[in-house]
């Protein structure tokens, strides 16, 4: 049995969890999310908690894989409950001279030192805000109830100009430490 999987998920007030045909649907003030759960995992909703247990009679013979699925689906359902009640937020910072970002609705316009601007259409589930203050690096603030989608979009944005190790220029998460290298002049002595 998975250590993570056997922990119960408490359902906060204002959130409803339903189960139909191995699909768990979570509705809350921030939105609605659905997730298919493998038949090797049983889902039970009782007195304000969601419990996931392993189905011993499942067709899945590999016990290790069943244990892994147990922890995986518990984490996915827990992320959905947190997402529809509180939401998720990630901040990206643009480090570099002339690096800018502006948004028009759900379209972000990036100026990242290339000969052309990069435009990115965001999914409708993600809310975006850009901040540019004098003498500070521009920020992109992304919010969503879907943790997986938010992380995927942030990784895509970061891939436009990954931080380089010499000067640290590029797009990075706020609080992310970039491993720095000394230049060739430091190693020549």
From Swiss-Prot:
GO terms for biological process: cytoplasmic translation. One of its GO terms (molecular function) is rRNA binding. InterPro entries: Ribosomal_uL6-like, Ribosomal_uL6-like_a/b-dom_sf, Ribosomal_uL6_a/b-dom, Ribosomal_uL6_bac-type, Ribosomal_uL6_CS. It comes from the Bacteria. Keywords: Ribonucleoprotein, Ribosomal protein, RNA-binding, rRNA-binding. Disulfide bonds: none annotated. One of its GO terms (cellular component) is cytosolic large ribosomal subunit. The keyword Ribonucleoprotein applies. It holds the Pfam family Ribosomal_L6. Belongs to the universal ribosomal protein uL6 family. This protein binds to the 23S rRNA, and is important in its secondary structure. It is located near the subunit interface in the base of the L7/L12 stalk, and near the tRNA binding site of the peptidyltransferase center. Part of the 50S ribosomal subunit. This is Large ribosomal subunit protein uL6. It comes from Phocaeicola vulgatus (strain ATCC 8482 / DSM 1447 / JCM 5826 / CCUG 4940 / NBRC 14291 / NCTC 11154). The gene is rplF.
